[in-house]
Structures are given as structure tokens and as C-alpha cells.
Curated annotation (Swiss-Prot):
Source species taxonomy: Bacteria, Pseudomonadati, Pseudomonadota, Gammaproteobacteria, Pasteurellales
InterPro entries reported in the protein's UniProt record: Dehydroquinate_synthase, DHQ_synth_AroB, DHQ_synth_fam, DHQS/DOIS_N, DHQS_C
Binding-site list for Zn(2+): E183, H246, H263
Annotated Pfam families: DHQ_synthase, DHQS_C
Organism (species): Histophilus somni (strain 129Pt) (Haemophilus somnus)
GO-annotated cellular components: cytoplasm
Protein name: 3-dehydroquinate synthase
Biological process terms in GO annotation: amino acid biosynthetic process; aromatic amino acid family biosynthetic process; chorismate biosynthetic process
Record-level Gene Ontology MF annotations: 3-dehydroquinate synthase activity; metal ion binding; nucleotide binding
UniProt keyword terms in alphabetical order: Amino-acid biosynthesis, Aromatic amino acid biosynthesis, Cobalt, Cytoplasm, Lyase, Metal-binding, NAD, Nucleotide-binding, Zinc
Length: 362
């Protein structure tokens, strides 16, 4: 088992990474008599709910669960209310613990429920998708979507532990594995050129879910994110770099309708647009743009803007991005692979030109 620590003084917590951890009682920060509400969905429940429940009951916990509809389109206030209703009906108090058992959607909703219920209860992340394991389960971002924008209603709320059982990836559809690799590639692109080079060598090992490479990769991604979160928990500066491709990607998700493109797929195309824009602004070399595109293609990810979106369709969504300040668009761009920066007030004609260039690739 590997362990990465997120250092936030009294709110520090471990990220446990290994095979078969769902059944390992010692990784759960719980004790006899604790009340637990597991938030999951029907698909994940059929694979893993009994394993987690059995382990918690052996510890001596009282365990209940609530199962939410599946998919990004259900990351809503209505789903949040289902959690609150389940907690209240079962008389859960401020001493309860909420466990998110699922992917990024479940983690985001359950985390926001934990932040909100009776002004905050204990929260444990058990991410079961690659995207959630390397990204959304770490760092304390919780949210639900609004019809006008993704993740517009939420809070920063740290878990007390993240438990990553890499065996859960064996039941994921291949499309979900590929989508998760977009966030993996992002880490190399923004902050770690050596990791990017490692990915170029081992992307096929990751696609094949070879455990040795998978655990090493997940640990590296978690360490990069943990270091950034330690330095900038609430995204006042450096943490914004973790959003490479996300401003464009969120525009794609919102415009097409949540769930039509997976988050990682939209981020992959968003990274390509950001790379093309960086090149047009004179920063990123054409060779680095090509390397990024090649790696995304090897991960079976889209690198072209959707056929049904015009360049002009992006801007209204992008102007609602949380990084916009004083009405000015702020974008995460690249100077080189491994070196990202936040560009302020980029000329919109350059942005539109980059999107159009990415559209021509389809």
C-alpha cells in the first residue's frame, strides 16, 4: 500500500492507495459506535456496497446508504436533497460520517452534503473511477451543477481520508478509464515534465490497467495535487493551474448537455485548445503541441472541438467560469510541457482562432 499525505495542519489527511483496500478496516478513520451514511449509485452499489458495509459493520459502525441517480446530469440540488432527507429520516446528527462511494459526481455531491449538513460532518472519499482517484477526490472541492454552469454551487471541504482501491478500476468501462487519463496527462503538462515523459513511455501500461504502473501513476498525481493544495487550498493562486483545459472543457459539457461528453473527454479537448492558443501567443512550441496531441490520442481521447459547437458558442459559457475576475477571462496556458501559467485578459480573437483551429482537426 502507498500513502500520500495532504498537509493542512489540523485538517491534514491521508490518501491510501492499493489493491483490496475496501476490505481493510485499518484504512477507515472510524470506530465502534460511529454512524455512517454511504452515498453511492446503483451501479457502484452492486459491485462494492456490500464489501464496504461489511467492513464497517465489523468495526462496529451503524451503516446506512442512499443511492442517487447515475450521471453528471444528476449532479443537482435535487440529488443533494435526497441525501439530506435520508440523513434526517435516519436521525443522523453532527457526529455522523458521510462516505462517498463512487466517481467524481458522487464525491462532489456527497462532499457538499457533508459540508452543509448541520454545518459540517465528517467526510470520507472512496473514489472508484480513475478520474476521481487522481483528481476530484483530493483537495476538498465539492459542488453541484446549475443549468447555467458547472460546479457553480459548492464549498471547499476537506475529507478526513481518501481510500483508493485500484481494483475498482477493473469494473469500469474503458471509456471511463480513458477519460480519467485526461486528468493524469494534465498533471504532467502543467507541473511535471518528467512525469509527462514517463507517461509517453507507459500510457499503454495504464490503459491496460497494469497494477504496478497504475499505483505509481495514481500516487504521483495525488502527490502533485496534494503539494499544490497544501500551498494554495482555496485557489487564490497556484491551484488555478490544475484547471488546464477546464474552462474550455466546462463550456463543452454545459453546451452539449451534462453527460453527453464525459468530463475527461471535454478536458482533453480543452487542453488541446489551450495548447494551440499557447502556441499562437508565442509560448508553447509546435513540437510540444504535437507531443500533447499524440499522448491524448494514445489514451483514446478526443482532440478536436465537437462538430456541433461553433467557436462563438464557447464564450458565453467561459465568461461564467469561476476564474473570471472583473469581467476578464483568465485562462490556464502553457509555456512548455511542465510549465503552466494563468493568462489574464487574453484577446478573445486569439481564443476564437484557437478554437477554430481545434475544430478543423475533426
Amino acid at each position: 500500500m502507498l500513502c500520500v499525505n495532504v498537509e493542512l495542519r489540523e485538517r491534514s489527511y491521508p490518501i491510501h492507495i492499493g489493491m483490496g483496500l475496501l476490505s481493510e478496516a485499518q484504512v477507515y478513520p472510524l470506530k465502534k459506535g460511529d454512524k455512517v451514511m454511504i452515498v453511492t449509485n446503483p451501479t457502484i452499489a452492486q459491485y462494492y456496497l456490500s464489501s464496504v458495509t461489511d467492513t464497517l459493520e465489523k468495526i462496529g459502525c451503524s451503516v446506512e446508504n442512499v443511492q442517487l441517480p447515475e450521471g453528471e446530469q444528476y449532479k443537482t440540488l435535487e440529488s443533494l436533497d435526497l441525501i439530506f432527507t435520508a440523513l434526517l429520516k435516519a436521525n443522523h446528527g453532527r457526529d455522523t460520517s458521510i462516505i462517498a462511494l463512487g466517481g467524481g459526481v458522487i464525491g462532489d455531491i456527497a462532499g457538499y452534503a457533508a459540508a452543509s449538513y448541520q454545518r459540517g460532518v465528517r467526510f470520507i472519499q472512496i473514489p472508484t473511477t480513475l478520474l476521481a482517484q487522481v483528481d476530484s477526490s483530493v483537495g476538498g472541492k465539492t459542488a453541484v451543477n446549475h443549468k447555467l454552469g458547472k460546479n457553480m454551487i459548492g464549498a471547499f471541504y476537506q475529507p478526513c481520508a481518501v481510500i483508493i482501491d485500484t481494483l475498482t478500476l477493473t469494473t469500469l468501462p474503458k471509456r471511463e478509464i480513458h477519460a480519467g487519463l485526461a486528468e493524469v496527462i494534465k498533471y504532467g503538462a502543467i507541473l511535471d515534465d518528467e512525469f509527462f515523459t514517463w507517461l509517453e513511455k507507459h500510457i499503454t501500461n495504464l490503459v491496460a490497467l497494469e497494477q504496478q504502473y497504475l499505483q505509481q501513476c495514481i500516487a504521483r498525481c495525488c502527490q502533485i495535487k496534494a503539494d499544490v493544495v497544501t500551498r494554495d487550498e482555496t485557489e487564490k493562486g497556484e491551484r488555478a493551474l490544475l484547471n488546464l483545459g477546464h474552462t474550455f472543457g466546462h463550456a463543452i459539457e454545459t453546451h452539449l448537455g451534462y453527460g453527453n461528453w464525459l468530463h475527461g473527454e471535454a478536458v482533453a479537448t480543452g487542453m488541446m485548445i489551450a495548447a494551440i492558443l499557447s502556441n499562437k501567443l508565442g509560448d508553447l512550441s509546435l513540437n510540444d503541441v504535437t507531443r500533447l496531441e499524440k499522448l491524448l490520442i494514445q489514451a483514446d481521447l478526443p482532440t478536436a472541438s465537437p462538430d456541433t459547437m461553433k467557436a462563438e458558442d464557447y464564450l458565453p459559457h467561459m465568461m461564467r467560469d469561476k476564474k473570471v475576475l472583473a469581467g476578464k477571462l483568465r485562462l490556464v496556458l502553457l509555456k512548455s510541457l511542465g510549465q503552466a501559467y494563468v493568462a489574464t485578459d487574453t484577446d478573445k480573437e486569439y481564443v476564437l482562432d484557437a478554437i477554430r483551429t481545434c475544430s478543423k482537426k475533426s
